[in-house]
Amino acid sequence: ERGITLSGGQRQRAALARALLADAPILILDDALSSVDNQTATQILRNLSEGTRRKTVLFISHQLSAAASADRLFVMDQGKIVQSGTHAELIAQTGLYQTLWDKQKLEEILQ
């Protein structure tokens, strides 16, 4: 950092930029949006979508709205895959994804 103090969100954005510049065919993002606000997260996701069209992206997140646009979602509970499908398919099912989605949407409304 050499005398420059970066916030958590700034560090995350810098790490994400480095990962994208590496131009690897597979990109693994583990909770890459945890330190950024919702507006910044939306912008990052839009840019990621455009910048990773021909790549495999494994996007790990507890923020379901960030993962909703993925081609395929895998829902894990206690280390096991309990559901998989698109966002629309998982919302239509009664299960963990639908429960978590409803809870997160309610939390967003209350904030």
What residue spans do the PLM features occupy?
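C-terminal portion of ABC ATPase nucleotide-binding domains
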Residues: 46, 68-111
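Catalytic Walker B motif of ABC-type/P-loop ATPase nucleotide-binding domains
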Residues: 27-31
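Conserved ABC ATPase nucleotide-binding domain "signature" region
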Residues: 1-4, 10-13, 39
